Structures are given as C-alpha cells and as structure tokens.
Amino acid sequence: MSKFMNVVRSKVKEGKKDELMKKLKEFFDNMKGTDGLISMKLIQTGPNNMCTIGEWKDEQSIAKARDKMIAGLGTVRSLLEEISPELGVTDPVSGPVIMEDK
C-alpha cells in the first residue's frame, strides 16, 4: 500500500487572510491524531492563493477522514473566493505517492 496525498487549492477573499489563518489553525489542530494522517501543510502560492497539502498513510485513511475534512471546509468556505463556477471555492486533487526522495 502506498502513501496518499491530497492538495486543495483555494483563494482567500481580500482582507480575510488573518481570519482564514486562524480558522485553518483550528482545523489543523482538530485533524491532529486523525488515523492515518502523517502531516498537513499550508503553502502560499500567490498573494491570496494557498494550497493545503495532506500526507496520508494510505487511500483508506483519507477516505475515512473525508467527512471531517468537509466539515473543516465548512468553517472557512465564507472566507474563500470562487475559483470558477465549475469548481466553486476549492480545487481539490488527490492520488497515490508514486515517487518519494527520503
């Protein structure tokens, strides 16, 4: 079984970054101890653009945590700009790790 990663791209509304950071800190704290979660990171890819990255033991672990992650999104949804009508406020992708440099 291979590790599994998820990446969620989002764009914070103007003037809402501090509030978003506070809510995401609470979300990260809430996710601590989630079965199979190895790590979570937040990177800034532009002035208002961010990606949340999760590393998981396996695909089953992320599947079990999906409801918890969706609930976390619910706490920040109002702070995010719509990326597009098709995507909404997030652009999530996930998949197995196929190469890793240790």
Which residues fall in each region the model found?
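Short coil/turn motifs at secondary-structure junctions
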Residues: 13-15, 45, 57-59
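Glycine-rich beta-strand-turn "strand-cap" elements at beta-sheet edges
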Residues: 2, 9-11, 38-51, 75-102
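Short acidic, gly/pro-rich beta-turn/loop elements at beta-sheet edges
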Residues: 18-20, 52, 62-64, 102
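An amphipathic, aromatic/His-enriched active-site/gating alpha helix that lines ligand/cofactor pockets
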Residues: 26-39, 55-91
